[in-house]
């Protein structure tokens, strides 16, 4: 008899069929067991869980007594209680490699569109405001040869540094827990303290995950240390930046502008002051949102779950210590 799993996000048909070759697949649209008795029943039998979003905590895990593996179609996993999963011996799988290049593309797009005011000026053209040759009140600022400061030199940070260094001749600064030899050799990157990064970067690019240590890592004090001409780009996690402090800094000219793919509350509330600021480019968490990459993420998550439940995991496990007990 095939193991039973719960799939709580729509995936391409061929990937669904791949899962069905190995498991009895119970498909649902999201995780709301209180309103879906069928989902509650499926969770009781499920050995695997695959999807994205939802809060997977101790209370949720009590609904799934037979769960052995959870596979998230994302690189981030802050919606999972990793400690609770590990205590139960449940492997948590994620997709850290397949979205790297696409997220780096998104960050470059935010840098360019924010610096050159692409979104704002496109809307002004559509509104019929372009009636004569433009003046300097429509000008943006250059990206090339400016200093990029990367907060978090992981896979995405490396991909961003590559684009900045080779594509735009940008000096690369970075702050991370330890020096990154490859970044320094390939891109001439310079490891520095957070204070130095804030003081010298023309573009502060945040790629950090959300943890207790990174929560509000960039707040009023840190923003005040940045250049008044600096632009903040966040495609990591929203709560890494104190959003209220950022709004104030953008309103009073402490920093020049911001390009944001992530927010403290998502979707971004319609009454957010961020939506009223011309010096903000806000996009709806599209970092990995291309057809190709989302397919590859789903395929990776499918493989991850198959590997986890068949005992063949070699990578992409958040809590590999539990595999010893499987």
Swiss-Prot record:
Reported function: Catalyzes the NADPH-dependent reduction of glyoxylate and hydroxypyruvate into glycolate and glycerate, respectively.
PANTHER family: 2-HYDROXYACID DEHYDROGENASE-RELATED, GLYOXYLATE_HYDROXYPYRUVATE REDUCTASE B
Keywords from the named record: Cytoplasm, NAD, NADP, Oxidoreductase
Gene Ontology MF annotations: glyoxylate reductase (NADPH) activity; hydroxypyruvate reductase (NADH) activity; hydroxypyruvate reductase (NADPH) activity; hydroxypyruvate reductase [NAD(P)H] activity; NAD binding
This enzyme's EC code(s): 1.1.1.79, 1.1.1.81
Gene Ontology CC: one annotated term: cytosol
Annotated active site: 237, 266, 285
Organism: Yersinia pestis
Name used for this protein in its record: Glyoxylate/hydroxypyruvate reductase B
